[in-house]
Amino acid sequence: QAPKIIETITDNREDDGAGNYFYEFETENGIRQSVRGTPGAAGAVIKTGSFSFPLDDGTLAEFIFEADEYGYRVDSPLIPVAPPNPSHVEELLQIVAQLKAQGAQWNDQGERID
C-alpha cells in the first residue's frame, strides 16, 4: 500500500537577503512549524521558533526553541524536569559556596586540599 500523501496547507517564506528570514508551514495532519532567523554575533545565526504535532491520543505536542552561538534550547511541557533539590542539599551547596569564597579547594575526588 502506498503511503498517504499529506498536503501542505500553509507555506509562507520571507527572506530580506541580509540574513533575516521567516518561514512557517502547516500540513493537513496538524504538523506546524514557524522559524525566524536573524544575524547573530561572529557570523552566527539566531533562530527562534516553535513546532507542534498531534499525538495519537489527540493532544497537541508543542515546543518552542532558540538556537544561537550558545547551542539549541527547547522548552515544552512534555520535556521532563528534574525535581528540586531537597532542602539539605541546598544548605550544603550554600556551605560549599561560602567555603569557596574563603579560599577552600577540593581535588578531583572531592577531598578538601587547603
Swiss-Prot record:
One of its GO terms (molecular function) is structural constituent of cuticle. Coiled coil: none annotated. Transmembrane segments: none annotated. The keyword Oxidoreductase does not apply. Keywords: Cuticle, Pyrrolidone carboxylic acid. Residues 18-83 form the Chitin-binding type R&R domain. Pfam families: Chitin_bind_4. The modification Pyrrolidone carboxylic acid is found at Q1. Arthrodial membrane. InterPro entries: CHIT_BIND_RR_consensus (IPR031311), Insect_cuticle (IPR000618). The keyword Ribonucleoprotein does not apply. This is Cuticle protein AMP5.
